[in-house]
Swiss-Prot record:
Chief location bin: nucleus
Compartments, record wording: Nucleus
Origin organism lineage: Eukaryota, Viridiplantae, Streptophyta, Embryophyta, Tracheophyta
Tissue spec. comment: Expressed constitutively in roots, leaves, stems, and flowers.
Organism whose genome encodes this protein: Arabidopsis thaliana
Pfam assignment, any one: HLH
Keyword entries, A-Z: DNA-binding, Nucleus, Transcription, Transcription regulation
Protein's name in the database: Transcription factor bHLH52
Signal peptide: none
Length: 264
């Protein structure tokens, strides 16, 4: 059997396939798509942003950092993976540095201890040796003296007003105002008595008025009811006065007083 020379290519040594490198594995020229480069490149994202450069090597591939022996054909993943600073979701070396700084600061804060303050706080007191003295301002001292003087004068006024021991401070001042009015009216009556009853025998009337006005209980009753003591003889003399007769209201009040048995 004669083999034609044209068929001798079946016995020719086939070329040995070379391993494809990462940059040649996906090359369009391998499949005869060179004339489609301008077509599919428009649909692919920018390599600068999303596809890392295979020659960019961020990690150190020294044997000291590798715990296991890695075959050469697996370096495709190692060499092609790198951090993309433009991708917000990819990790960055700065994030590891910030995390280490935060952990260091947090550990320092956890070691901080607040000073131990006393739970008691005293205002206006100072400690000098074993004794404690209160610090007072000039205004506080003046106010304390003023309150002390008011208290002393109030106690002295209460001794002069009949029945003041039965009242509180406000009621005592009200009773004091009425008592002052009673004294003023009683003094005017006594002065008028001296001018109107000079010709009458007023010795008996004078003794009776002295007895009445000398009693604390009677003074309290008179000042509370806002009235004063007037002798009957003096009222009868005033009734005949022309100024009283010309004033119907005063004349009516005098007749009312004379009709009662309260006045002597």
């Amino acid at each position: 059997m004669i083999i034609p020379e044209t068929d001798s290519f079946f016995f020719q040594e086939q070329p040995q396939h070379q391993p494809l490198y990462p940059d040649e594995a996906l090359s369009p020229s391998l499949f005869g798509f060179d004339h489609y480069d301008h077509f599919y490149e428009s649909f692919l994202p920018s390599q600068e942003i999303f596809l890392p450069s295979p020659k960019t090597r961020v990690f150190n591939e020294s044997q000291e950092l590798d715990s296991f022996h890695t075959p050469k054909h697996q370096k495709l993943i190692d060499s092609s993976f790198h951090f993309n600073s433009h991708d917000p979701f990819s990790p960055s070396p700065e994030s590891n540095y910030l995390l280490d700084s935060y952990i260091t600061e947090a550990s320092n804060i956890s070691k901080f201890q607040a000073p131990d303050f006393s739970s008691t706080f005293k205002v206006g007191w100072t400690e000098q040796g074993d004794t404690k003295k209160r610090e007072l301002s000039a205004q506080s001292i003046a106010a304390r003296k003023r309150r002390r003087r008011i208290t002393e004068k109030t106690q002295e006024l209460g001794k002069l007003i009949p029945g003041s021991q039965k009242h509180n401070t406000a009621e005592m001042f009200n009773a004091a105002a009425k008592y002052v009015k009673f004294l003023q009216a009683q003094i005017e009556i006594l002065q008028l008595k001296q001018t109107k009853m000079q010709t009458l025998d007023s010795s008996k009337v004078g003794r009776e008025m002295q007895f009445l006005l000398g009693s604390q209980e009677i003074q309290e009753k008179l000042s509370t009811e806002e009235v004063c003591v007037v002798p009957r003889e003096m009222v009868q003399v005033l009734k005949a006065e022309e100024c009283i007769l010309t004033n119907p209201k005063i004349s009516r009040d005098i007749n009312k007083l004379l009709s009662t048995n309260l006045m002597n």
